[in-house]
């Protein structure tokens, strides 16, 4: 019965995905009719196995759609050289391509395109078919971003019956995610000059060779010059590669070596390792001596939770040095007060009394001047340490000069996922993604198990350098006393030019809102509504277009599922990151 139900659910999902594609195709036809510029001189495709029937079929469809002849640079395998001259759509002077060869392993793509007159090259993996509308979308993207360094697009899987399934809707540029997994695995558009500038690499693994190429092409590029085309422009053939992308595949030695070489080229003091849950884990080196971390823990009564939190920090944390600043917000239970007095015998712990009406932002702000540390850790009193090296992991990331805030992986008491990053726009403002997953569930594209950037993380456990906190003027205690203060802070950190990183390798339990509870009174509901509205007014542009998400993905679901509304969120008639009317 369970298998039947799962099959029915998958069938319904595939049907909704194809209905969604049909809605997008209606707009695409309209967009073609309204196109005012010709794409022909901007269309170059490079495929590493053009004899693959799906690839060949897609190329033939593409030629049929052109309004005038185009040049084509094809990067192919040695074994397909002879068959290229037999492709019927290449016959005749107007459609004669330049073709070049590249070995599937250990070869140099730069050498393969050296003789090409084309400045723009689209790289298409051998197990992919090209969407017929891809040249048009590439041309439009180039017109919008003429100084691009690299472009990439969404992808899906083509079934034998002509249907489509398993959409891979990518997020915006995410440097930390690319260090964890080669998430840009479909159609990639690059400049010929950039390919020619690459040094030849002797890498025996196809997947590692591709990952190395992506890292080299992006590691010196400005973020604004790495462009995501939020449309499905390629279709994977075969389930193996799709399965790898839908979850976090285990990295082999060649892939780990590729990431390590990238870190070395970028002078990043870190070591790459194969992560037990999949992908690559990068351990960032700590400065010597390690900086003092100041843990700020607001609390009120709730002795059991506070004792559990403090005990887990003291008994399990392997990092040193650290201090704990407990902010007592008016505790009046005798057992709690006695416990607070006992804690002061530990030289690492200080108690700060602050009896003002509860204002999470103000309590943390007021505690910062009391901290001696270079690193600030905002820690709820209802968390419990799981991984002993949680602070090593988070401090290592927080001390990176381009990182402004770091979040942890948090689990509910029942061992389901509570926090794996915050996605903007869901529910109107934001929501935790991948909630309620079990430990063995990797999440969409494996992202519940991979270090990556988000626009925001929760302050239930968040680290940042003190200088960054002071630069952005801390929490906004006037506008966001209780709700959204951590999201607002992270967005100001992002606006200041820093990255916000979430790591799955620092794990804690979070017995969520166990001390204060949910918003139940009329006064609490009114306060929440006011803070909700302030977030919408201050950050509406960001809330509607989170770069850690995909503009085709649903704003209703917490699992990265694509939009199944009557019309897709992404528009072809206006800039991609504007919603359709």
Predicted feature descriptions by range:
Residues 64-69, 86-98, 144, 311-321:
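Short, acidic, metal-binding catalytic loop of nucleotide-sugar glycosyltransferases
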Residues 2-71, 249-290, 414, 426-453, ...:
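C-terminal, non-catalytic tails of nucleotide-sugar-dependent glycosyltransferases
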Residues 72-82, 93, 294-305, 309, ...:
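A conserved hydrophobic helix/loop-capping motif in glycosyltransferases and polysaccharide synthases
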Residues 194, 204-231, 259, 390-394, ...:
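A short, conserved alpha-helix in the catalytic core of glycosyltransferases
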